[in-house]
């Protein structure tokens, strides 16, 4: 997927969390047989959804729900934390 498509869609969606929600929802609609709103040229559904978002053809019906979504995040693990799959299994 083209980076420019994601960056353009991000400008329209407002933040990356809203973009993910909107892109997934539209991708599912396309997978179920919805008619694409842009020329998809054999692109996968997620790319078509991002292009539609970037072209302002797809948007949230209730954008006020996203007003509380923040871009702030923090890491929940430090360098000493083990990750799932790192442990040795003993039988």
Swiss-Prot record:
Q: Which GO terms describe its cellular component?
A: DNA-directed RNA polymerase complex
Q: The organism sits in which domain of life?
A: Bacteria
Entry annotated with the keyword Transferase: yes
Provide the assembly information. The RNAP catalytic core consists of 2 alpha, 1 beta, 1 beta' and 1 omega subunit. When a sigma factor is associated with the core the holoenzyme is formed, which can initiate transcription.
As for what it does, the entry says:
Promotes RNA polymerase assembly. Latches the N- and C-terminal regions of the beta' subunit thereby facilitating its interaction with the beta and alpha subunits.
Q: Into which family does the record put it? A: Belongs to the RNA polymerase subunit omega family.
Q: What is this protein called?
A: DNA-directed RNA polymerase subunit omega
Q: Which organism is it from?
A: Syntrophus aciditrophicus (strain SB)
Gene coding for it: rpoZ
